[in-house]
């Protein structure tokens, strides 16, 4: 009685078939002609990570272009051009009623909060009109009735002290100071104008990230190409 004769024969036959399949590439002959083998060097794990890093940097730069273009560049380009003039402080006032605002900065400052509304009235030397002064164009878009809007709500006493410090500064500054107004109307007089620095920062950093990612991917491809050429040269020398 031979219970294991059939499996042994199957195993031997399978082994002969595998030997026959592996013997063909090893012989290097197909229809009498030698096989042309094109070696393909596998990329290392470090090269794969570097390539992924470069692609991620390029993708993030495109996202930065989109976000900065819609949130900063678009309002800046659509805003009317401003001309420089001189302003003289007439009087300052802190409204009795605090205003509600949704603070969106990071950390514990997120959420709803209130802040004191500081109003600074100045005399515009260009037209002689009494107008409301704002810190910058963002303050006009956020709340055109106040000089500025705090970035974070923080402590109530801290917000009030900050508003009082700014009020005291304008009360003691009786001279004239430069300001910027819109020729379209007396509204929207700002203390600080957003200039070409905004455009520079919105374009420079995403472009730098894009070029850095492309440089990393290009260096990885160049390294792989040089390695492949080196292996071909070594194969020719050994032959």
From Swiss-Prot:
One of its GO terms (molecular function) is calcium-activated potassium channel activity. InterPro entries: K_chnl_Ca-activ_BK_bsu. Its main location: membrane. GO terms for cellular component: plasma membrane; voltage-gated potassium channel complex. It is a multi-pass membrane protein. The chain crosses the membrane at residues 52-72, 198-218. N-glycosylated. The extracellular domain contains disulfide bond essential for the gating mechanism. This is Calcium-activated potassium channel subunit beta-3. It comes from Rattus norvegicus (Rat). The gene is Kcnmb3.
């Amino acid at each position: 009685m031979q219970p294991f004769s059939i499996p042994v024969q199957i195993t031997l036959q399978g082994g002969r078939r595998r030997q026959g399949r592996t013997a063909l590439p090893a012989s290097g002959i197909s229809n009498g002609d030698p096989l042309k083998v094109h070696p393909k060097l596998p990329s290392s794990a470090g090269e794969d990570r570097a390539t992924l890093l470069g692609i991620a940097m390029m993708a993030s730069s495109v996202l930065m272009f989109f976000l900065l273009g819609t949130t900063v560049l678009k309002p800046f380009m659509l805003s009317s051009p401003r001309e420089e003039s001189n302003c003289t402080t007439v009087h300052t006032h802190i409204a009795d009623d605090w205003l509600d605002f949704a603070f969106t900065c990071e950390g514990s400052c997120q959420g709803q909060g209130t802040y004191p509304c500081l109003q600074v009235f100045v005399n515009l030397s260009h037209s002689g009109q009494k107008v409301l002064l704002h810190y910058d164009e963002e303050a006009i878009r956020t709340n055109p009735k106040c000089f500025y809007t705090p970035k974070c709500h923080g402590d109530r006493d801290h917000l009030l002290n900050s508003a009082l410090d700014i009020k005291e500064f304008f009360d003691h500054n009786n001279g004239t100071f430069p300001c910027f107004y819109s020729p379209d109307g007396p509204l929207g007089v700002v203390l600080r104008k957003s200039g070409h620095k905004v455009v520079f920062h919105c374009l420079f950093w995403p472009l730098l990230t894009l070029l850095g990612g492309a440089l990393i991917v290009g260096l990885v491809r160049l390294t792989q190409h040089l390695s492949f050429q080196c292996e071909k040269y070594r194969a020719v020398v050994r032959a």
